Amino acid sequence: MKKFLLTTSTIAALFAAGITGANAGNSASVYQGGKHNTGVFTQNGYHNKGTIDTYGNRNESKAVQQGEWNYLYQQQLGNRNSALTDQYGRDNYAVTGQEGRHNTATTVQTGRSNTSGIAQIGNNHKAVTDQYGSNNTSATIQVGNGQKAKTVQTGHGNTSVVIQGGY
């Protein structure tokens, strides 16, 4: 019975949070340590924000924001890594940091002020940044091991910097 009540109240709380979070001041945080990790959140309209911190082991995280002020931050330390950031409209801004092991980071931004930063240190790297319309700006830094970077920018301010160094 206790398990049922706990599960029911958890579902109710998540449902309520989803309704208010979809069109309010938004904000989301996921902090994880060790083992099989995976962090996911989706936000819809208004003030958005973000943050996903993952420490060690199999990692993987996905964050999706849709409209208004956006902002996102993802950090992954150690092991199999992989981070996806999708932002669609308005002030955008995304930062992804990865350290150690298989890495891979993808940032997709669509319209407005854009800005993307990806830093990868150690092991098999690979970074993709897609920006489409408005002020754009992209920086990718990769140090040590696999490297690879791809940046696609389409209309408006554009600017892309890729720095790669080995050891």
Listing of model-derived features with the role each one plays in the protein:
Residues 24-167:
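Low-complexity repeat regions of mature extracellularly deployed or surface/particle-associated proteins
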Residues 18-24:
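Sec/Tat signal peptide C-region and signal peptidase I cleavage site
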Residues 1-8:
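Positively charged n-region of N-terminal signal peptides that target proteins for export
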Residues 8-17:
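Bacterial N-terminal signal peptides
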